[in-house]
């Protein structure tokens, strides 16, 4: 693509402190890869990072999915494919914007070394996470990716993920859910989607959603109440965003289509 690209292997991710991402990858024989692509220009008007969830197959881990729910899980890297698509064509448009494309790619498998419910993980920013369910793995990989992106000195971070079934329950397959910490960024993304024939619907990101994620032995759990699951996941991700405008787009409903 003509981009500056770095691909970190397992050992390099360990040195970077990506304990949450690497935990998800432990159950698979496939090597995890953390991918950072960069489109760079002189005197950029702003700097943006886009992150795509890159679970190349999601069995659910030890909290394994039913067989029928696993059939489409090769598509759990849909957001990573979106990021690759953007980065593959960005040079054709010559935007005066520095863009970082970030993907934490791995499988979530129930191998003999798999991470377990009850494990305590340490993310890149030092926050600890109690594993409540190994099938809530996407947010763990995104946690370290968000920390990494926030260290790049960017103005905005946008993450995309096939993150929650709860978003599909709320919005069906006709819209993606969006939330974030900056109203202007969120509204700009909603308006841009509408102009291009897509639908984003803003979901709340109230602090009260974090109540169900509280842990007695860690800074947070990776899952909480069954209610408000899309927003609960968003509040979890927010804990790994620092000093940057951020938006989270849950594309589960619009990615897993069979038509």
Residue ranges, per PLM feature:
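A generic structural signal for tightly packed, nonpolar segments enriched in small/aliphatic residues
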Residues: 1-259
